[in-house]
């Protein structure tokens, strides 16, 4: 399917997701691990990336400077923090590198910076790189078109204790998919907190609830509730390799693109369904 190999660089190589991405890159056919990055001053600098990820010797040492490895990769994969990702984005735009962005928690200015950069480089920007989650998003659009006008819609998400943003990017993507199907703007209909005497539920709103506990990888449920029945659409992840494999698969797909902003629905061709 892919005539040429794609060389990838991994940001945050020492993190939980970074190590999974390194494993996925080393295991996936057609992909070469070209570089692995960590922050300046990290004790992991100079270590072998494959050994760091528990995947054996790779011959790629962890570096702190993108400039030092700019000749070693075609696509940069970033699941770090918004401020770091935006710095990497500027570098990739300047040097014509494709980018896979799985970082969540961007404000409107950050999202606009990604859109602007996509005029010059190819970017896959997704809240979740799991195949199953993206199929779920498509199912939510279909369900919302049929049931969304007369049901109460709630989104519940659960993640591990270390996750720093809430609601999760995936939960927000679920809300956006539902709102899009109903010709609404999520900003106008989302309810993120309920406390005290809230009064009755406002019709047409989309509620969000967040759980942070233990080592939960990721669980998301959308509820369409009517009187007498409800439909629940749920996705549960048991391993971060699901996300890592999707991200690396996206890098393969992105290799042939010159510029533009894409998401996993483009990669999986779900927009044709």
Curated annotation (Swiss-Prot):
Family affiliation: Belongs to the DapB family.
Source species, domain of life: Bacteria
GO molecular function: 4-hydroxy-tetrahydrodipicolinate reductase; NAD binding; NADP binding; oxidoreductase activity, acting on CH or CH2 groups, NAD or NADP as acceptor
Biological pathway: Amino-acid biosynthesis; L-lysine biosynthesis via DAP pathway; (S)-tetrahydrodipicolinate from L-aspartate: step 4/4
GO cellular component, one term: cytosol
Protein keywords: Amino-acid biosynthesis, Cytoplasm, Diaminopimelate biosynthesis, Lysine biosynthesis, NAD, NADP, Oxidoreductase
Top-rank EC class of the record's enzyme: oxidoreductase
Role according to the record: Catalyzes the conversion of 4-hydroxy-tetrahydrodipicolinate (HTPA) to tetrahydrodipicolinate.
Catalytic residues identified in the record: 159 (proton donor/acceptor), 163 (proton donor)
Record EC number: 1.17.1.8
GO process annotations (BP): diaminopimelate biosynthetic process; lysine biosynthetic process via diaminopimelate
Sequence positions that bind NAD(+): 12-17, 38, 102-104, 126-129
Binding site for NADP(+): 39
Catalysed conversion reaction: (S)-2,3,4,5-tetrahydrodipicolinate + NAD(+) + H2O = (2S,4S)-4-hydroxy-2,3,4,5-tetrahydrodipicolinate + NADH + H(+); (S)-2,3,4,5-tetrahydrodipicolinate + NADP(+) + H2O = (2S,4S)-4-hydroxy-2,3,4,5-tetrahydrodipicolinate + NADPH + H(+)
Quaternary organization: Homotetramer.
Binding residues for (S)-2,3,4,5-tetrahydrodipicolinate: 160, 169-170
Organism per entry: Enterobacter sp. (strain 638)
Name of the protein in its database record: 4-hydroxy-tetrahydrodipicolinate reductase
Subcellular location(s) of the protein: Cytoplasm
């Amino acid at each position: 399917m892919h005539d040429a190999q794609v060389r990838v660089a991994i940001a945050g190589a020492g993190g939980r997701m970074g190590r999974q991405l390194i494993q996925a890159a080393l295991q996936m056919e057609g992909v070469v691990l070209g570089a692995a990055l960590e922050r300046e001053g990290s004790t992991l600098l100079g270590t072998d990336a494959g050994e760091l990820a528990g995947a054996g010797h790779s011959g790629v040492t962890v570096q702190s400077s993108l400039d030092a490895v700019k000749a070693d990769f075609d696509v940069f994969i970033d699941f770090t923090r918004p401020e770091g990702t935006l710095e990497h984005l500027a570098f990739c735009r300047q040097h014509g590198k494709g980018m896979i962005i799985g970082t969540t928690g961007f404000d409107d200015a950050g999202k606009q910076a990604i859109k602007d950069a996509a005029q010059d480089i190819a970017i896959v920007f997704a809240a979740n790189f799991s195949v199953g989650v993206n199929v779920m998003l498509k199912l939510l659009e279909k369900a919302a078109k049929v049931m969304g006008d007369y049901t109460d819609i709630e989104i519940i998400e659960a993640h591990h204790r270390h996750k720093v943003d809430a609601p999760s990017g995936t939960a927000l993507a679920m809300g956006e998919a539902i709102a899009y199907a109903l010709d609404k703007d999520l900003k106008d209909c989302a309810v993120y907190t309920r406390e005290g005497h809230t009064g009755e539920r406002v019709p047409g709103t989309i509620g969000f609830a967040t759980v942070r506990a233990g080592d939960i990888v990721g669980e998301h449920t959308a509820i369409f509730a009517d009187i007498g029945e409800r439909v629940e659409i749920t996705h549960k992840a048991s391993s971060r390799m699901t996300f890592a494999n999707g991200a690396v698969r996206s890098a393969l797909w992105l290799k042939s693109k010159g510029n533009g902003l894409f998401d996993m629905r483009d990669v999986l061709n779900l927009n044709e369904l």
